[in-house]
Amino acid sequence: YRQHRYMANVAGMGFDAMVVKKYAHLKKKGHSNKWLYTWCMIRSFFSYKSTGVKVWIDDRLVYNNLLMSIAIGVCKYNGGGMQQLPEAVADDGLLDVSLIRPVHFWHILFRFRYLFNGGIYRIRHILQERGSRIRIESSPEISVEVDGELLGESPLEFSVLHRAVRIVVSEEFLKRESYPLCSCNIV
């Protein structure tokens, strides 16, 4: 059984998806403030168990071990200004990938600012990859959230739909900036 979904920003698996699930549950109950997402991250950190994951990028096995979380996308920012993919470029035709290996709470706590200032790859537990086609298998299955919405579980495949979005802008904008956008297809 396969589903096709599209994303415009970032997808998260494992820990990321658990945080989104807790956040959605609390919002549904009427709770809402600017620190709610951070609170959900902290609560999830102590209950999430890392999962055995295999990651292929462009048909090359790049990771086969325990992972806490995975972020895949075309943009830098998600979840209230976090930069899980600080080197992502929306129009380069590639998906950026951050693989977060199991890490102790205190190690992350003292480096939490890197998640917001673009320095996430300074944390030794976080690996960076890039490619046009990403495949993920895990045991047990891990959940996935796409642009903040829970969508399903592994196995997952991500690929880029080149120049799939057309944007109408003024000539003045084109003279200043040139960023044709792309979308991603989640299979």
Regions found by a protein language model. Give the residues of each.
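Catalytic core of DAGKc-family lipid kinases
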Residues: Y1-M68
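Glycine-rich phosphate/pyrophosphate-binding beta-alpha loops
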Residues: G12, D16, A71-L85, L150
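Short acidic/glycine-rich loop or secondary-structure boundary segments that cap or lie
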Residues: D16-V19, Y63-N65, N78-G81, F105-I108
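Gly/Ser/Thr-rich active-site loops/lids in small-molecule metabolic enzymes
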Residues: K27-W35, N78-G80, P86-H107
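Exposed beta-strand and adjacent loop surfaces of beta-rich binding modules
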Residues: S50-G52, L94, E141-S143
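ATP/nucleoside-binding phosphotransfer catalytic cores, i.e., glycine-rich phosphate-binding loops
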Residues: I57-D59, N64, V89-A90, L99-V187
